[in-house]
Amino acid sequence: MAKKVEAYIKLQVAAGAANPSPPVGPALGQHGVNIMEFCKAFNAKTESLEKGLPTPVVITVYSDRSFTFVTKTPPAAVLLKKAAGVKSGSGRPNTEKVGTVTDAQIQEIAETKAADMTGADIEAMKRSIAGTARSMGLVVEG
């Protein structure tokens, strides 16, 4: 018989840097999950990613207090800021541009995000990511 699911917890945790401090500790503690066990497993799974890259994770907590988790790809906005070499997006994206991304960079981000995005094809994903870039005040070349 399958285990009974008690809760789903969605968090964004820095890759390779999960620790019991907030937001991880309180979110897992209220469901009775072993926090250090999660931190060790998460850090081991994300060691191949760039350290500190915000990584969405969905944790499934079962009634016997065991858990499983699935890591997602980093948010498109984070990948776009990294590609453009900017610290943050523009406060006024229509008038104030803060950086530039090329079509090749958008293609690379779309391929990275392909596993998580529900787009029909790579072109649709590229358009979605280009739209995100424009809404952040980035100029899309190509």
UniProtKB/Swiss-Prot annotation:
InterPro entries membership: Ribosomal_uL11, Ribosomal_uL11_bac-typ, Ribosomal_uL11_C, Ribosomal_uL11_C_sf, Ribosomal_uL11_CS, Ribosomal_uL11_N, Ribosomal_uL11_N_sf
Gene Ontology process terms (BP): translation
Domain of life: Bacteria
SUPFAM superfamilies: Ribosomal L11/L12e N-terminal domain, Ribosomal protein L11, C-terminal domain
Post-translational modification: One or more lysine residues are methylated.
Keywords, comma-separated and alphabetical: Methylation, Ribonucleoprotein, Ribosomal protein, RNA-binding, rRNA-binding
CDD domains per the UniProt record, alphabetical: Ribosomal_L11
GO cellular component: cytosolic large ribosomal subunit
SMART domains (alphabetical): RL11 (SM00649)
Example GO molecular function: large ribosomal subunit rRNA binding
Record's subunit section: Part of the ribosomal stalk of the 50S ribosomal subunit. Interacts with L10 and the large rRNA to form the base of the stalk. L10 forms an elongated spine to which L12 dimers bind in a sequential fashion forming a multimeric L10(L12)X complex.
Task performed by this protein: Forms part of the ribosomal stalk which helps the ribosome interact with GTP-bound translation factors.
Similarity comment: Belongs to the universal ribosomal protein uL11 family.
Protein name (Swiss-Prot/TrEMBL): Large ribosomal subunit protein uL11
Record organism: Vibrio parahaemolyticus serotype O3:K6 (strain RIMD 2210633)
